[in-house]
Amino acid sequence: MNKLGDTLKQLLVLCVMLWIGVLETQAEEFRIRVMSYNIYRGGTMHGQPLSQTAKVIREAKADIVGLQEPRSPKGFNTERLAKILGWNHSANIRKGIVLTPHEIVANFAGGIKVKLPSGQHAYVFSLHLPSNPYQPYQLLGIRPKWHKHWDTPFIKTEVEAIEAARKARGGEVSGLLNQIRDLPDKEAAVFVVGDFNEPSHLDWTEEAAVAGRHPMKVEYPHSKAMSKAGFADAYRTVYPDEMKHPGYTWSPMYKTDDPSTHHDRIDFVYFQGRSVKLIGARVIGENEENADVVVSPYPSDHRAVVAEFMLSKPTPRTEK
């Protein structure tokens, strides 16, 4: 009987120790969903209330959102949207906007430093890069009716596309990457989200060109710049096959075969950090054919993308 009692005590102690270990692991990890969302002219241009834009964010179950195009014809809707959600927003309500229910402990040009409930910190930057000249339209000879730049030249080669993209967006991307390199906390998670107004070299591949999806292979410079700087593209990491999972975010306003546009993936969630583990990524949009999460009616001309991550407290580096 004593041996049985001792065995039961040992099992009880073991169970308690295992339970404590589980609790400690949970305390050292935190799950977040980071979203990039161009809300299209303040979120109300389709005649829908701003609450529908808030619904998109809620349905995505995001808790950090990089926002683009907050300005409506009546003014900037950043503060209104944050109020509907009951969230905090970055100090700049016009550009580099980030919304989150978590505590914002610092504001930067184009982003924030956020404190998570786990005590961990993360940096989040939101980009909205210039849309003109837009290389897919230049290569395909497209001038949409709504386009203001009727003098934009058409181009024919990959070299021309790369050069035009660098000229249009290179300064902003380089500036942001320099800013990130100067961050004091080298161990913290860093997220860069936004409407890049430029496709990815991971999508405009030789295979995609041969299949007729895109007019040619293009090594777009700024997706490559993000990769060179140590960032990973969340959606394309989860879905590496660009042919099976195009992940188009531009644009739900057009039919697939509409010759006045070209469907593409130009909205991204990039991530970096030893403590960051990617769990999944989804597109939010207007129907099941084009999105993983459906919100109808859909209030924007861009589909949103949200990625889920597990953040763990980084282990100290050991010197060799």
Give, region by region, the residue ranges found by the protein language model:
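N-terminal, active-site-proximal structural segment of metallo-dependent hydrolase catalytic domains
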Residues: 3, 9-10, 22-83, 121-122, ...
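Sec-dependent N-terminal signal peptides
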Residues: 11-19
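Catalytic metal-binding/acid-base residues of hydrolase active sites
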Residues: 40, 71, 128-130, 196-199, ...
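Active-site neighborhood of phospho(di)ester-bond hydrolases with catalytic His/Asp-centered motifs
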Residues: 65-68, 91-92, 99, 191-195, ...
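Structured beta-strand-rich core segments of catalytic domains in phosphoester-bond hydrolases
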Residues: 68-146, 282-283
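Metal-dependent phosphoester-hydrolase catalytic domains
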Residues: 107-117, 181-190, 197-320
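A solvent-exposed, charged loop/short amphipathic helix patch at secondary-structure junctions
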Residues: 137-164, 207
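His/acidic metal-ligating clusters that form di-metal
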Residues: 165-193
